Amino acid sequence: MANIASQKKRIQRSERERRENRFRISQVRTWFRRLEQAVAAGDAGAAESEYRQLLSKIDKAVKTGALHRNAGARRKSRAARIRARLGN
């Protein structure tokens, strides 16, 4: 356990940041699942809506540092391929 006040604050801040990052990554996973379910159901309208929301969540996670830039690009690419399955 830290004894120095600034280190105690840093521990609190690290924990707060960890929770924020986990929340953002969890949102990305959730919207990814929702997109897959909409595509599996064949619902084009819902899939498009889920896709847009997913891209927004990914961009936000990258912007805040919860996801690396390349990881965000990879997830967006995968999402686009999943959405493209509706066209077949």
Model-found features: residue ranges?
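Ribosome large-subunit tunnel/peptidyl-transferase-proximal elements
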Residues: 2-88
